Amino acid sequence: MEEMSGDSVVSSAVPAAATRTTSFKGASPSSKYVKLNVGGALYYTTMQTLTKQDTMLKAMFSGRMEVLTDSEGWILIDRCGKHFGTILNYLRDGGVPLPESRREIEELLAEAKYYLVQGLLEECQAALQNKDTYEPFCKVPVITSSKEEQRLIATSNKPAVKLLYNRSNNKYSYTSNSDDNMLKNIELFDKLSLRFNGRVLFIKDVIGDEICCWSFYGQGRKIAEVCCTSIVYATEKKQTKVEFPEARIYEETLNILLYEAQDGRGPDNALLEATGGAAGRSHHLDEDEERERERIERVRRIHIKRPDDRAHLHQ
């Protein structure tokens, strides 16, 4: 499986074992292609790109440094190949969009230092400084409308968790533990947002129609919902009960991480298929399998206790 990127090709093939060290001697630098194995990722690129800027790569391919080559002619570079395509794009174009993640910018900075790509190094350092100066550790938007919520979820490349809490929606009095449980739900949401903010979009909703409800989104659609409220009878009077289903909330949060993008390639469909996620399922299904898929793809709505089931119960 190979992916094209400009004048480079990247593959995950494994090189042959036999190697030798030589000084690189190339002809026709404007047209000659070079085969590179960077930490197991294979790239084709041109001499023109490699020697365009004054970097370690230019030194390697102008004969000033020795290079290690395997028996199939692949030049071996003992570095992680994850960001090498970005390095090549920068050498070719003179600029690249930087990753959003601080961790990935730091990884790219380390590669820029190794290859002595001064311009990219300075851009990464400036981006990290801006993040330190202007960006808080954790951002949690509080939505103002359903359209804003839809836009946030549709445009995010992360899975999303939304907590809706709105005490003003209650028509009855609360049970004795409801206020404490409401606070526990809010506190857990805050803890999860601090722990997973780099991987999950967390959203607060204080204008919705529920009293306390968690929603979980993957690939732009709702995957599961945990409703924490129910109506109970106490001394012949209806009351609203808020519960704190901590284990269920943790379970659905971990499930939603299956929809996390993998190095910009989208979620791991094999993992989704193995764990029952709808996105990983085959499109070639018979009628029974199709019905089962539709059942699974419906939103998992978990109500701690259903009001209908409790309509005739008295406490």
Curated annotation (Swiss-Prot):
It is found in: Nucleus. GO terms for molecular function: Notch binding. Pathway: Protein modification; protein ubiquitination. InterPro entries: BACURD1-3 (IPR045068), BTB/POZ_dom (IPR000210), SKP1/BTB/POZ_sf (IPR011333), T1-type_BTB (IPR003131). GO terms for cellular component: Cul3-RING ubiquitin ligase complex; MKS complex; nucleus. Pfam families: BTB_2. GO terms for biological process: angiogenesis; heart development; negative regulation of Notch signaling pathway; proteasome-mediated ubiquitin-dependent protein catabolic process; protein homooligomerization; protein ubiquitination; ubiquitin-dependent protein catabolic process. Disulfide bonds: none annotated. Keywords: Acetylation, Nucleus, Phosphoprotein, Ubl conjugation pathway. Homotetramer; forms a two-fold symmetric tetramer in solution. Interacts with CUL3; interaction is direct and forms a 5:5 heterodecamer. Component of the BCR(BACURD3) E3 ubiquitin ligase complex, at least composed of CUL3, KCTD10/BACURD3 and RBX1. Interacts with DNA polymerase delta subunit 2/POLD2. Interacts with PCNA. Associated with the tectonic-like complex (also named B9 complex); however as Kctd10 has not been identified in all tectonic-like complexes purifications it is unclear whether it is really part of the complex. PANTHER family: BTB/POZ DOMAIN-CONTAINING ADAPTER FOR CUL3-MEDIATED RHOA DEGRADATION PROTEIN FAMILY MEMBER, BTB_POZ DOMAIN-CONTAINING ADAPTER FOR CUL3-MEDIATED RHOA DEGRADATION PROTEIN 3. Belongs to the BACURD family. This is BTB/POZ domain-containing adapter for CUL3-mediated RhoA degradation protein 3. It comes from Mus musculus (Mouse). The lineage of its organism: Eukaryota, Metazoa, Chordata, Craniata, Vertebrata.
